[in-house]
Design a protein with these regions (language model features):
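Feature captures the FAD/FMN-dependent oxidoreductase FAD-binding
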Residues: 76-153
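Glycine-rich active-site loop/strand segments that organize a redox cofactor
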Residues: 47-97
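Glycine-rich loop(s) and the adjacent beta-strand/alpha-helix scaffold that form part
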Residues: 153-197
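Short hydrophobic core segments
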Residues: 7-9, 131, 149-165, 176, ...
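An anion/pyrophosphate-binding glycine-rich loop and adjacent beta-alpha core
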Residues: 36-38, 43-44, 52-59, 92, ...
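A glycine-rich dinucleotide-binding beta-alpha-beta segment and adjacent secondary-structure elements
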Residues: 127, 291-369
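Glycine-rich FAD pyrophosphate-binding loop
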Residues: 23-47
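N-terminal Rossmann-like FAD-binding beta1-loop-alpha1 element of flavoenzymes
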Residues: 4-31, 387-391
Length: 391
């Protein structure tokens, strides 16, 4: 049996951050990673350049059953703290849009930074190793594929089941259940939405088309880009709203935000009555989409031929298009997982399980889900840092 102070299961963003922070405190730390190399999701994120944080990050950018849970960790270790770390390692970066920070070169820069920090404080990182069993007496005994490891603190940083091709599973939830902790049902988040067969047939004609929209589900809305795909809808707007969508709910799409299309059509009818409705709409939204909506609504002809009632029908499809998804593309393409270990079971200051001293949960395995744009990485850094001060 090998003894450490801290065993961290999961060598991703949260796990490595926790490891280096615990190591700075003189703790003997081992990270167990089942993959051949650590930080797999960092490597593929942001098109290989890693959207490592967002300078506008606040607790309001996170979804959880307890909307206040993330406040403590984010306050103690925020975007500026991680940016300072990046700058100390001379990693070049840039702001792409909406506060999203990316590496100029490669996500590998972030991975090397984390591993260098871990190495500097004596953290041991073991790859291609799986956990077979865990039990707790005075310490945690972790049976791995390479023998038994004992430690006073056990950190679960194994993520959620999103992107299973990277080896992602819901293993961390099994550990939580073993210790009688509540789980908020995990579902795919930041994921494309799908529609019925009739819609799929229609959407194929729009595949590849992108348009800036406002999308709303319930009381939540986002102004971002929509991308039509051969399977349904994707793009930042849809990925964002997917975290708030539930089965059976409508989403409302405004294809021309900040424009009153009905009023514009009435004015255009007065000035150019012989203009075809498709032509008029093509001046407001992309032509392919204008043709689709006219076909979809059965509204066609010149503006002079169309009553205000008909104009209102087509205008509402532009400004208030209500549509009901029949599902999502699932964990296979989901960027993150919504749900996880209930925050009611954890200390927001330390990430320690209230009922199991020495057991910690950090990162995606916890019921804290960020918006698209670097927020989930910031939660990984913040929660990992928080636990690293106490393990």
């Amino acid at each position: 049996m090998t003894d450490y102070d801290v065993v961290i299961v999961g060598g991703g963003a949260a796990g490595l951050m926790c490891a280096m922070e615990a190591g700075k405190r003189g703790r003997r730390v081992v990270v167990i990673e089942k993959g051949k190399v650590p930080a797999g999701k960092i490597r593929i994120s942001g098109g290989g350049r890693c959207n490592f944080t967002n300078i506008h990050c606040t607790p309001n950018h996170f979804h959880s059953e307890n909307k206040h849970f993330a406040k403590s960790a984010l306050k103690r270790y925020g975007p500026n703290d991680f940016i300072s770390l990046v700058e100390n390692h001379d990693i070049a970066y840039h702001e792409k849009t909406l506060g999203q920070l990316f590496c100029d070169n490669s996500a590998q820069d972030i991975i090397k930074m984390l591993l260098d920090e871990c190495e500097a404080v004596g953290v041991v990182v073991k790859t291609s190793m799986t956990v077979e069993h865990i039990d707790k007496n005075e310490t945690f005994n972790v049976l791995t594929s390479d023998g038994m490891i004992s430690a006073s603190s056990l950190v679960i940083a194994s993520g959620g089941p999103s992107i299973p091709k990277m080896g992602a599973t819901g293993w961390g939830y099994d550990v939580a259940r073993q210790f009688k902790l509540k789980i908020v049902d995990p579902v795919p988040a930041l994921v494309p939405l799908t529609f019925g067969e009739a819609f799929i047939f229609d959407f194929r004609a729009l595949s590849g088309l992108a348009v800036d929209i406002r999308v709303q589900c319930g009381k939540t809305s986002f102004d971002e880009a929509l991308l039509f795909t051969h399977r349904g809808m994707s793009g930042p707007a849809i990925l964002q709203i997917s975290s708030y969508w539930r089965s059976g709910m409508d989403i409302t799409i405004n294809l021309a935000p900040n424009r009153n299309v009905f009023e514009e059509l009435k004015i255009q009818k007065e000035h150019q009555p012989k203009q075809e409705i498709q032509t008029t709409l093509s001046g407001i939204i992309p032509k392919r989409l204008a043709l689709y909506l006219c076909d979809h609504s059965g509204v066609s002809g010149t503006l002079a031929d169309l009553s205000h009632k008909k104009l209102k029908i087509i205008a509402d499809l532009v400004n208030v298009w209500r549509i009901t998804p029949n599902g999502t593309e699932g964990f296979a393409t989901a960027e993150v997982t919504r749900g996880g270990v209930s925050t009611s079971e954890l200390s927001s200051k330390t990430m320690e399980a209230n009922k199991v001293p020495g057991l910690y949960f950090i990162g995606e395995v916890v019921d804290v889900t960020g918006h698209l744009g670097g927020f989930n990485f910031q939660w990984a850094w913040s929660s990992g840092h928080a636990a690293g001060q106490f393990v």
